[in-house]
């Protein structure tokens, strides 16, 4: 899961891209990068770490240009390392840079095809580099000295035919401008906004979430539709066209559960309101299963579950309290690359307030239970703080299946609910009672925000994958490639480390 930004402005855009990336930091903490274009030359700065650590004032001063793209990365395809920081770049044709959020499920096939048929070299194991080279090759086939918007749209139409999976991308083409596109299923989010400069010039931004627009005063004007492509020329003219044959709006439901910020709008759905509805639906299930629940207090696991927890407590008519204090300098445990890092992080990240636990029946609320690492330790912390009984509620259904569209849930045997009943999960995490949201209720909570959606990508809950190329062989291959043990081994060997091949300048 990653954060994307693309901008075309009246003046240098690097500072606004930086600000937007800080608003998307929750989507990826492994690496960050910005690439801009000025007078036909591309400039870049990228590296491992948080946005604030990768960029310094001397770097920003070198990132000149009125259009550019930015990326905050969390690795889902390929290992971690400086060589995989985005954007990626190819010099032919034109000079193209691209940043990508999602996962190509036919990446291995495309890699072979690019080498054997398209005569293109790939330097990493990242599917983002694959996507860039497919796009570049399709533009090159058109043979234009400089592409027109209709050429961009033609190339992206073929990209949609060749590439399978869930993806949103922003790209810049030297001497042309900004390009953004989204997969035909609309799995990964991408929004577009505009801002009127003091001179009257209209400036444009595309981003993974609407909060990235807010920080620089951009007005949300809508979403990049499934299968759609947007071009903004260097002169600031916006073009958009549907490039897929049969697009359907089926966004990833886990964005609403966990990844997106609550103050974001995506696909016309308020994440905040959706999580409020999740809490209300969960309260109804609690009352169905335990009318005499005896709950004294509802306590959220910071931060994602706070909104659902407030709604849940209100509907139950019990107190809502902040029973855990969060260390703001520890990253999100779900998106930490290794299991050992996640385990170590929980107690560093959260500390209980004993007053809220002593001699009480406590209902802890979290957005979901993935590996069970966090909730098991938190339940133990609640008991140590004096809780009489510890109940646990998940605002999402049991996560039983791997995600193949850009969220790091790679290995089924690492998912605590895979192959287990709810009762078995309860015993494993040590709760006195465990309640999950029903899938039908979860989907209804999001659909209420936009009845026009065709459905939701919910494969982590039901095992039904939108793209037809997902079989047991594929799932086993990604389990082997992306399991925590394999990822640690690959990083230790430096599989994806080494020199970053790309642009080299003072940034």
Residue ranges and their predicted role:
Residues 314-362, 373, 400-410:
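Short, glycine/charge-rich flexible loops or terminal/linker lids adjacent to PRPP-binding catalytic cores
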Residues 202-209, 248-251, 333-347, 387, ...:
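Flexible glycine/proline-rich, aromatic-decorated loop/lid segments
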Residues 55, 129-134, 320-331, 428-446:
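A conserved beta-strand->alpha-helix junction
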């Amino acid at each position: 899961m990653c954060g994307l930004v693309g901008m075309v402005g009246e003046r240098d855009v690097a500072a606004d891209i930086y600000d937007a990336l800080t608003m998307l930091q929750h989507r990826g903490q492994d690496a960050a990068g910005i690439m801009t274009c000025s007078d036909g030359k591309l400039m870049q700065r990228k590296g491992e770490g948080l946005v604030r650590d990768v960029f310094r004032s001397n770097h920003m001063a070198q990132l000149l240009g009125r259009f550019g793209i930015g990326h905050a990365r969390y690795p889902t395809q390929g290992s971690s390392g400086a060589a995989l920081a985005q954007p990626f770049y190819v010099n032919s044709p034109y000079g193209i840079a691209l940043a990508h959020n999602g996962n190509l499920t036919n990446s291995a096939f495309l890699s072979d095809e690019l080498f054997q048929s398209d005569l293109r070299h790939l330097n990493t194991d990242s599917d983002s580099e694959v996507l860039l080279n497919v796009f570049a090759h399709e533009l090159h086939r058109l043979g234009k000295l400089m592409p027109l918007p209709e050429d961009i749209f033609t190339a992206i139409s073929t990209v949609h035919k060749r590439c399978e999976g869930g993806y949103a991308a922003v790209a810049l083409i030297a001497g042309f401008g900004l390009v953004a596109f989204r997969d035909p299923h609309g799995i990964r989010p991408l929004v577009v906004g505009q801002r009127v400069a003091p001179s009257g010039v209209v400036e444009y931004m595309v981003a993974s979430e609407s909060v990235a627009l807010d920080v620089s005063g951009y007005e949300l004007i809508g979403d990049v539709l499934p299968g759609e492509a947007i071009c903004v020329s260097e002169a600031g003219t916006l073009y958009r066209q549907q490039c897929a044959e049969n697009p359907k709006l089926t966004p990833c439901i886990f964005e609403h559960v966990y990844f997106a910020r609550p103050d974001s709008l995506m696909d016309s759905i308020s994440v905040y309101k959706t999580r409020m509805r999740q809490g209300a639906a969960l309260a109804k299930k609690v009352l169905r299963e335990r009318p005499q629940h005896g709950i004294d207090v509802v306590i959220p696991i910071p931060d994602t579950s706070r909104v659902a927890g407030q709604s849940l407590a209100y509907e139950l008519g019990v107190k809502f309290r902040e029973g855990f204090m969060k260390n703001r300098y520890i990253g999100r445990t779900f998106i930490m690359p290794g299991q050992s890092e996640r385990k170590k992080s929980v107690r560093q990240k959260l500390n209980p307030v004993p007053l809220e636990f002593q001699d009480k029946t406590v209902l802890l609320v979290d957005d979901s239970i993935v590996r069970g690492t966090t909730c098991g330790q938190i339940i133990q912390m609640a008991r140590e703080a004096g809780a009489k009984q510890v109940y646990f509620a998940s605002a999402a259904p049991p996560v039983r299946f791997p995600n193949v569209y850009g969220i790091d849930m790679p290995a089924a045997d690492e998912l605590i609910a895979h192959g287990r009943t709810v009762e078995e999960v309860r015993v494993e995490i040590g709760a006195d009672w465990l309640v999950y949201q029903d899938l039908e209720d979860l989907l209804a909570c999001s659909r209420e925000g936009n009845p026009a959606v065709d459905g939701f990508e919910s494969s982590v809950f039901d095992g039904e994958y939108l793209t037809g190329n997902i079989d047991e062989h594929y799932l086993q291959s990604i389990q082997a490639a992306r399991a925590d043990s394999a990822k640690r081994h690959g990083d230790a060997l430096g599989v994806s480390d080494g020199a970053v091949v790309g642009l080299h300048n003072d940034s």
